[in-house]
Amino acid sequence: MTALASLLVAATVAANPFEKPGLPAYLWNQPEPVNLPELLVTAAGERVVSSAAWERVRRPEILKLFEDCVYGRRPVGRPDGLAFADEAPEKTMMDGRAIRRQVAISFKAPKGEGVIHALAFLPIAEKPTPSFVLICNRPRAKNLDPERMTRTEFWPAEEIVSRGYAAIAFYYEDVAPDRYDGFASGVYPLYGDPAARTETDWGALSAWAWGASRVMDWIETEPRLDAKAVAVIGHSRGGKTSLWAGATDTRFALTCVNDSGCGGARLNHLLLSNAETIGFLRGAQPHWMCAAWGRWGGRELDAPFDQHQLMALVAPRLLAVGSASRDMGAGPYGEYLSAKLASPAWELYGRRGLVSAAFPKAGEARQEGSLSYHLRAGEHDLKLSDWNRYMDFFDRSQKK
């Protein structure tokens, strides 16, 4: 337990940010992290004091740790035969403010072919625009309507475009199914034998994050988009996915992680009653991670990894973490503390991480550094107010 974490716990208890009656007591009586793995100490026991040492030694160590123990090893990076084709003619929409593109991102694999369908609304602008890529884990018909007859706050494309960003999304099950028995379909059988999976083979979250990188491949070919200013965003299991996407693909300038909980932003070594654990997800969603992750179920405090280390892989790029005050399963304070404990990685580059003296109250945000955190009042969801927080944060970097 570090002195920093002790101070954070004390500040949180004193601040008591959750004042509404009826909420579980754990929200204002936080336990301390136990056996927290070191961020800036190498496997050989050497302290990391420079960005060069971080990139040369410690960052690769942490990346491999999460590949082997959490998300699994990908059998492929950028695939062969990658191609992009319009599935419908371009169309001017949103009262003349945007161009719609529907793009088939196809690829060839040793055992077949695959395709990811991307939907994009590009602002009509004089110069290339920044963009947000949503990993959509909610029904396509309701949330990704290309005609915009059906709209939701989950993907508020009109509002995104009005802020000067391209709104881009893909449906996660284009890449891999979201079910425990889905390894015989999607991308998995294209690159391996589903009947001969090992404990370190990639799980669904890694496959979905791989899909986000393929959308990024397309963005790099679209001259109306600024490929140096792309944010990846996801909610819940999509938030777990966006964090892994941002950690593994340095082309994403901003990584937005919304209500992601265990396996996403929340610390495993912080025991919170009513919050997801590795043991719970091992039984409820065994396909999300590699099989090796499950060995830490019920032994979370012994795990040699934790999510502050994963967050640090995004440094020195931008990272934004969002929580909801009533999202007990995700464990908001654990998400906040993870971001705080990841901040020293940004400091190696002479940048500030999360600038915050205490856990914010519901409705507040901390966005002064390169790492943003906000706490929305409400339930587990991705709302327009969350999007506005993420766009506000990205706006600041666009103006520099």
Report each predicted region and the residues it spans.
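Primarily recognizes the serine-hydrolase "nucleophile elbow" in alpha/beta-hydrolase
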Residues: 139, 143-145, 213-276, 284, ...
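Mobile cap/lid helix-loop segments that gate and shape the active-site cleft of serine hydrolases
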Residues: 187, 257-310, 335-356
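N-terminal cap/lid segment of alpha/beta-hydrolase-fold proteins
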Residues: 73-131
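Conserved strand-to-loop "acid loop" that flanks and positions the catalytic carboxylate
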Residues: 315-332, 376-378
